[in-house]
């Protein structure tokens, strides 16, 4: 931090948005204007420093979240640049989990787009205060005021306008600063490094006065002193106004909205000022709640203090070809020095910290110490995975784990040779450690290795990384939909596993109540055994059996989700019972339940947003209906129609080609996972045949 231990001069922020809204371009300008780098890296040239992977530079998109640190106005800003493509939403999720604030970037032409809504909801989930930056104001069709309306209508947010654009499209030259009531214009020959303050253009003065009055009216509600002064007709000073805005942002009462054009080098410095002035420091964030490692029911409060015991959360693991495994952590309290030993409370094991590294994308800087509020990477950890808590050995605490989305697509991969088989095992173990949304399993019938991920692009990148980084040559099957199964009725099952073949036998009796749960609940296991009907050392065998057997399905071999299993009674034999016997009994109970609990097949439903010229709307809607889709909403959008529909993922293969064909290449779409729904009876047979 700028002054050691001063948490108030630190900001941990993320840059988030829909793909192509300009997140990485904005981040590159931030790094240039703060002096972190002496040149501007352009995404379209494959030269953005934050997009360091080969695949990112080739495709011009961000795939993995990248961290860096810069300074502005004597404040340390730790920045995480996140992906905008829906297939890499896990990178946004785990970044927001450890950030104190965020900058949401919007395309000034497109406004609020599908992934904008997704990342906004993710930020809501973790109560992350944010400010908005309406980018690309130099583009033809950019509409700042329409974008503000969309932030209100589509995101349910309360926008607080702090700037107005000066000029439209190519004539965009700067902004009106409503807090200071002045204009800011940029000098193009300095790449935007130089800017000038001036008078507000006369044609914007009336609008500026109107918006400033609205700004003050909303802001003073955050401070009694300011409210009384306002009601008495007094002048609200700039420092008092900024203090009110800051309180409202931290309290999630509203979101400040600024504008500019990162690519044209306009608007970035005031955005940095807003980050420092309005987003919270680690000391502004409420205390973190954890649980005792020895007693999960006992709550533990962690304060953002350098002087308290060390507590941190591991939010990302990556493999560096030079230093091996790197574990990214956010420190919530205390300090950590190199060569320390810490407790991984999630694993119940100690870890030796080798080096502490400050990261700039994939570049590393050794540092001797980190403390509360810092984000850094640790080298040398062996057992830590994403979501684990690291803490002082004398303060065993567990922070809340992260939730990761269900995979919706899968592919089969087969190594070309025996040598590739060995390399593939190593590659996949490392990639799974890095990416919690990637799942790997082996098909019990075909013996094929199955990769499960968030979409076609996600899996395509994984296969490409196996080849480039690990030298694995593999044949890849066509993408398949990741169907699921669930139950619709409760069923109470009594099952006895008994086997006697001479010598030691096997005996286990279980009574399990199976119940359906709401969508998205996953699997829950509850032990209600009383009076020692089943010894406690056998209970894990029951849970393990259910965890294993639910992956084999009931109808078509797909994993079973959204149900609860309650073990409420049973029996054991002093000699013949064992954990294995109870595991087998649980599996038998599950298979018997499948015939009584109304099993059904589930399919992933995608939210699809299509922008099409009016003349093709009829064809597009007809095509949506033919794919078993449901049109949920239609809106006017810049001489076109925005159609929101929900369509089964299994019906979306090849859609990009079909949409281009029916619209002569003028329509476009984006989609992301919405939920799992029951497959209609008339479509079940088709799924079973696949």
From Swiss-Prot:
<dbReference type="InterPro" id="IPR041095">
    <property type="entry name" value="EFG_II"/>
</dbReference>
<comment type="function">
    <text>Catalyzes the GTP-dependent ribosomal translocation step during translation elongation. During this step, the ribosome changes from the pre-translocational (PRE) to the post-translocational (POST) state as the newly formed A-site-bound peptidyl-tRNA and P-site-bound deacylated tRNA move to the P and E sites, respectively. Catalyzes the coordinated movement of the two tRNA molecules, the mRNA and conformational changes in the ribosome.</text>
</comment>
<dbReference type="Pfam" id="PF00009">
    <property type="entry name" value="GTP_EFTU"/>
</dbReference>
<dbReference type="InterPro" id="IPR009000">
    <property type="entry name" value="Transl_B-barrel_sf"/>
</dbReference>
<keyword id="KW-0648">Protein biosynthesis</keyword>
<dbReference type="GO" id="GO:0005737">
    <property type="term" value="C:cytoplasm"/>
</dbReference>
<feature type="binding site">
    <location>
        <begin position="81"/>
        <end position="85"/>
    </location>
    <ligand>
        <name>GTP</name>
    </ligand>
</feature>
<dbReference type="Pfam" id="PF00679">
    <property type="entry name" value="EFG_C"/>
</dbReference>
<dbReference type="InterPro" id="IPR035649">
    <property type="entry name" value="EFG_V"/>
</dbReference>
<keyword id="KW-0963">Cytoplasm</keyword>
<dbReference type="InterPro" id="IPR000795">
    <property type="entry name" value="T_Tr_GTP-bd_dom"/>
</dbReference>
<dbReference type="GO" id="GO:0005525">
    <property type="term" value="F:GTP binding"/>
</dbReference>
<protein>
    <recommendedName>
        <fullName>Elongation factor G</fullName>
    </recommendedName>
</protein>
<dbReference type="Pfam" id="PF03764">
    <property type="entry name" value="EFG_IV"/>
</dbReference>
<dbReference type="Pfam" id="PF22042">
    <property type="entry name" value="EF-G_D2"/>
</dbReference>
<dbReference type="InterPro" id="IPR005225">
    <property type="entry name" value="Small_GTP-bd"/>
</dbReference>
<dbReference type="InterPro" id="IPR053905">
    <property type="entry name" value="EF-G-like_DII"/>
</dbReference>
<feature type="domain" description="tr-type G">
    <location>
        <begin position="8"/>
        <end position="283"/>
    </location>
</feature>
<dbReference type="InterPro" id="IPR047872">
    <property type="entry name" value="EFG_IV"/>
</dbReference>
<comment type="similarity">
    <text>Belongs to the TRAFAC class translation factor GTPase superfamily. Classic translation factor GTPase family. EF-G/EF-2 subfamily.</text>
</comment>
<dbReference type="InterPro" id="IPR031157">
    <property type="entry name" value="G_TR_CS"/>
</dbReference>
<keyword id="KW-0251">Elongation factor</keyword>
<dbReference type="InterPro" id="IPR035647">
    <property type="entry name" value="EFG_III/V"/>
</dbReference>
<dbReference type="InterPro" id="IPR005517">
    <property type="entry name" value="Transl_elong_EFG/EF2_IV"/>
</dbReference>
<dbReference type="InterPro" id="IPR009022">
    <property type="entry name" value="EFG_III"/>
</dbReference>
<dbReference type="GO" id="GO:0032790">
    <property type="term" value="P:ribosome disassembly"/>
</dbReference>
<dbReference type="InterPro" id="IPR004540">
    <property type="entry name" value="Transl_elong_EFG/EF2"/>
</dbReference>
<dbReference type="Pfam" id="PF14492">
    <property type="entry name" value="EFG_III"/>
</dbReference>
<dbReference type="InterPro" id="IPR027417">
    <property type="entry name" value="P-loop_NTPase"/>
</dbReference>
<feature type="binding site">
    <location>
        <begin position="135"/>
        <end position="138"/>
    </location>
    <ligand>
        <name>GTP</name>
    </ligand>
</feature>
<dbReference type="GO" id="GO:0003924">
    <property type="term" value="F:GTPase activity"/>
</dbReference>
<keyword id="KW-0547">Nucleotide-binding</keyword>
<feature type="binding site">
    <location>
        <begin position="17"/>
        <end position="24"/>
    </location>
    <ligand>
        <name>GTP</name>
    </ligand>
</feature>
<dbReference type="InterPro" id="IPR000640">
    <property type="entry name" value="EFG_V-like"/>
</dbReference>
<dbReference type="InterPro" id="IPR020568">
    <property type="entry name" value="Ribosomal_Su5_D2-typ_SF"/>
</dbReference>
<dbReference type="InterPro" id="IPR014721">
    <property type="entry name" value="Ribsml_uS5_D2-typ_fold_subgr"/>
</dbReference>
<dbReference type="GO" id="GO:0003746">
    <property type="term" value="F:translation elongation factor activity"/>
</dbReference>
<keyword id="KW-0342">GTP-binding</keyword>
């Amino acid at each position: 931090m700028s002054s050691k231990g001063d948490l108030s001069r630190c900001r941990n922020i993320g840059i988030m948005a829909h793909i192509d809204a300009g997140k990485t371009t904005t981040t590159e300008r931030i790094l240039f204007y703060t002096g972190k780098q002496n040149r501007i890296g352009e995404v379209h040239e494959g030269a953005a420093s934050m997009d360091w992977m080969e695949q990112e530079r080739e495709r011009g998109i961000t795939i993995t979240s990248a961290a860096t640190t810069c300074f502005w106005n004597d404040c340390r800003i730790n920045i995480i640049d996140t992906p905008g493509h829906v297939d890499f939403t896990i990178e946004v999720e785990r970044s927001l989990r450890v950030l104190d604030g965020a900058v949401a970037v919007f395309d000034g032409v497109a406004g609020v787009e599908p992934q904008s809504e997704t990342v906004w909801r993710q930020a809501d989930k973790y109560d992350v205060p944010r400010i908005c930056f309406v980018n690309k104001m130099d583009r033809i069709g950019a509409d700042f005021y329409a974008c503000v309306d969309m932030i209100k209508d589509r995101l349910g947010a309360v926008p607080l306008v702090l700037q107005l654009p000066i000029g439209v499209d190519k004539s965009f030259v700067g902004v009106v600063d409503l807090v200071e009531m002045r204009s800011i214009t940029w000098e193009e020959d300095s790449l935007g490094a130089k800017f000038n303050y001036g008078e507000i253009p006369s044609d914007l003065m009336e609008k500026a006065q109107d918006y400033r009055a609205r700004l003050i009216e909303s802001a003073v509600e955050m401070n009694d002193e300011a409210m009384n002064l306002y009601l008495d007709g007094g002048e609200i000073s700039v420092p008092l106004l900024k203090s009110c805005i800051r309180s409202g942002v931290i309290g999630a009462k509203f979101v400040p909205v600024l504008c500019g054009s990162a690519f044209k080098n306009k608007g970035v410095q005031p955005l940095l000022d807003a980050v420092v002035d309005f987003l919270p420091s680690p000391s502004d964030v409420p205390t973190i709640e954890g649980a005792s490692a020895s007693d999960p029911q006992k709550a533990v409060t962690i304060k953002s203090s350098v002087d308290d015991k060390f507590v941190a959360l591991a939010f990302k693991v990556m493999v560096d070809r030079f230093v091996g495994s790197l574990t990214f952590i956010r420190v919530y309290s205390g300090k950590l020095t190199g060569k320390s030993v810490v407790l991984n409370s999630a694993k119940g094991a100690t870890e030796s910290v080798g080096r502490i590294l400050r990261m700039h994308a994939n570049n590393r800087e050794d540092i001797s110490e980190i403390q509360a509020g810092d984000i850094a990477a640790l080298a040398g950890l062996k057992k830590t995975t994403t979501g684990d808590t690291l803490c002082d050995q004398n303060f065993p605490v567990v922070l809340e784990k992260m939730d990761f989305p269900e995979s919706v697509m899968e592919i089969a991969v087969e190594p070309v040779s025996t040598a590739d088989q060995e390399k593939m095992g190593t590659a996949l173990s490392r990639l799974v450690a890095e990416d919690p949304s990637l799942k790997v399993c082996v098909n019990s019938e075909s013996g094929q290795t199955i990769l499960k991920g968030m979409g076609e692009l996600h899996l395509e990148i994984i296969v490409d990384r196996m080849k480039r980084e690990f030298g694995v040559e593999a044949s890849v099957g066509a993408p398949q939909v990741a169907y699921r199964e669930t139950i619709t009725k409760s069923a109470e099952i009594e099952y006895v596993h008994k086997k006697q073949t001479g010598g030691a036998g096997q005996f286990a009796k279980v009574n399990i109540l199976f119940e359906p749960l709401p969508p998205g609940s996953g699997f829950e296991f509850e032990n209600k055994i009383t009076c020692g009907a089943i010894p406690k050392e056998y209970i894990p065998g029951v849970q393990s059996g259910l965890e294993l057997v639910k992956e084999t399905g009931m109808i078509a071999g797909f994993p079973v989700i959204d149900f609860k299993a309650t073990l409420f009674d049973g029996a054991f034999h002093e000699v013949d019972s064992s954990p294995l016997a109870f595991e087998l009994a649980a599996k038998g109970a599950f298979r018997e339940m499948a015939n009584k609990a109304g099993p059904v097949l589930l399919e992933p439903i995608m939210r699809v947003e299509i922008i099409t010229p009016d003349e093709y709307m009829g064809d597009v809607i007809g095509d949506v209906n033919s794919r078993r889709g449901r049109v949920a909403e239609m809106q006017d959008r810049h001489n076109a129609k925005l159609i929101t529909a929900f369509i089964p993922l299994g019906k979306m293969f090849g859609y990009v080609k079909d949409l281009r064909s029916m619209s002569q290449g003028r329509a476009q779409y984006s989609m992301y996972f919405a939920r799992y729904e029951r497959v209609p009876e008339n479509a079940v047979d088709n799924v079973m045949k696949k």
